[in-house]
Amino acid sequence: MFFFGMKTLIKKYRSRTIAELNFTENPSEIYIKKTGTYAVCIIGGGYANNKGDFDLHITNNGNKLDVLEKQMKFKFRHKGKLATEFYHFEIKNMGKYKFEFKNIADLEAKESMLLSKRMFQNTLSVNNVGIVIKETSSNTKFIIGLLMAVFGFNIAGLGIILAFNPQLYM
């Protein structure tokens, strides 16, 4: 149980970066070689929020993909900067995809994820914010992996305690 949970967490941690984008190069085209779930991540801020109509349109040969804002916005480090998973989408066919961001001014990105610090910070400018497209997994898979790692570690620890203290059985 512990090893399966840790395998899932390590896979999430080591997910591969597909492309780095800037808001200035709008729209951008990326060739995606593998099917699966991908995330659009905001680099430079521990907090990212859609204040209004900030949106992402992804098309492949004229077909629009469903892009959903993540409920649980995981944080990670990308080249020393804090990044936040913001959108996720599913790729079913390999090919060239066009990424177009709409209403970029409605994106609110701040350095700190703490509410008490965030109240006194200004919103980061678009020039200081970057975009990364990376592989990801679903939230439920991550939570199940985390729970399996914690429970597996606790069960293994309890087994070791009981193995070296046989008087606990009596």
Which residues fall in each region the model found?
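Acidic, Ser/Thr/Pro
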Residues: 1-170
